[in-house]
């Protein structure tokens, strides 16, 4: 059973986009598609998953040299907004011919 302790999906994607441009794009790409092999793609990920991961980094349950520092000052609204933004991005795959 997954309990995130509050509204996880009520974020504002527009606010999330602004926050992502400031805090996330350098590693995860401006549209959540990373060119950095050490940073995962975030575009199209389920909001509930992103909320859980950001809260884990913020709370110290999950450790990463960069993400732990970035997530620490995020409040629940920041996390919900970021999750809503990345979850709203549609990822399409071009099939090889």
Predicted region positions:
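C-terminal capping alpha-helices of c-type cytochrome domains
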Residues: 2-4, 48, 53, 62, ...
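N-terminal hydrophobic or amphipathic segments with adjacent small-residue motifs
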Residues: 4, 10, 23-26, 38, ...
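C-type cytochrome heme c attachment motif
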Residues: 21-30, 40-41, 52-55, 78-84
């Amino acid at each position: 059973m997954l309990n995130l302790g509050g509204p996880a999906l009520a974020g504002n994607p527009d606010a999330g986009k602004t926050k992502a441009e400031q805090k996330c794009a350098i590693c995860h790409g401006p549209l959540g598609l990373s060119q950095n092999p050490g940073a995962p793609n975030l575009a199209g990920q389920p909001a509930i998953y992103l909320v859980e991961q950001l809260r884990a980094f913020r709370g110290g349950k999950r450790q990463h040299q960069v993400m732990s520092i970035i997530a620490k000052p995020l409040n629940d609204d920041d996390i919900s907004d970021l999750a809503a933004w990345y979850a709203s991005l549609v990822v399409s795959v071009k099939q090889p011919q």
